[in-house]
Every structure is written in C-alpha cells, then in structure tokens.
From Swiss-Prot:
<dbReference type="InterPro" id="IPR009415">
    <property type="entry name" value="Omega-atracotox"/>
</dbReference>
<feature type="disulfide bond">
    <location>
        <begin position="59"/>
        <end position="78"/>
    </location>
</feature>
<feature type="site" description="Critical for insecticidal activity">
    <location>
        <position position="52"/>
    </location>
</feature>
<keyword id="KW-0108">Calcium channel impairing toxin</keyword>
<dbReference type="GO" id="GO:0005576">
    <property type="term" value="C:extracellular region"/>
</dbReference>
<keyword id="KW-0732">Signal</keyword>
<keyword id="KW-0964">Secreted</keyword>
<dbReference type="GO" id="GO:0006952">
    <property type="term" value="P:defense response"/>
</dbReference>
<keyword id="KW-0800">Toxin</keyword>
<feature type="site" description="Critical for insecticidal activity">
    <location>
        <position position="77"/>
    </location>
</feature>
<comment type="similarity">
    <text>Belongs to the neurotoxin 08 (Shiva) family. 01 (omega toxin) subfamily.</text>
</comment>
<feature type="disulfide bond">
    <location>
        <begin position="53"/>
        <end position="64"/>
    </location>
</feature>
<keyword id="KW-0528">Neurotoxin</keyword>
<comment type="function">
    <text>Inhibits insect, but not mammalian, voltage-gated calcium channels (Cav).</text>
</comment>
<keyword id="KW-1218">Voltage-gated calcium channel impairing toxin</keyword>
<dbReference type="Pfam" id="PF06357">
    <property type="entry name" value="Omega-toxin"/>
</dbReference>
<feature type="signal peptide">
    <location>
        <begin position="1"/>
        <end position="22"/>
    </location>
</feature>
Length: 79
C-alpha cells in the first residue's frame, strides 16, 4: 500500500468514526416543527406607497388602487 492509498483509507475511517460519534451525541436528530418555523420565519414587511402591489394586505397603507404607469398602462399600486 502506498502513501496516497493509506491516506485515503485513514480519511475514510476518520469520516466513519466522526459520523458514528455525531449520531451518539444527537447530531443527526431531526428538527422539531417549532425549530423549523423559527429558522425559516420571515419578519413581516409591507410594500411602501407607490410600489406595485399584488394584494391589498401587503401594502403598508392596506390600500391598493389602479394608477397609470410611465407607459400609460393601468397597474395596481399601494396608496
């Protein structure tokens, strides 16, 4: 066995031992649902006045009306 092969064998062995010890320490336990919600929770943001709005509830003013844009097309914008 040459040096490179021995190094690869030691690397694989260390990886296997590391995975086994992580499992014993609870490293591979699944997340609880509350943890996942906490990790992926986004802070509430609102769309400022004059910006396009797909839904009324996303506007800071809670109001959205059709207005002409620079091309003369009617688009919904937050009031």
């Amino acid at each position: 066995m040459n040096t490179a092969t021995g190094f690869i064998v030691l690397l694989v062995l260390a990886t296997v031992i590391g995975c086994i010890s992580a499992d014993f320490q609870g490293g591979f336990e699944p997340y609880e649902e509350e943890d996942a919600e906490r990790i992926f929770r986004r802070s509430p943001t609102c769309i400022p006045t004059g910006q396009p709005c797909p839904y009324n509830e996303n506007c800071c003013s809670q109001s959205c009306t059709y207005k002409a844009n620079e091309n003369g097309n009617q688009v919904k914008r937050c009031d």
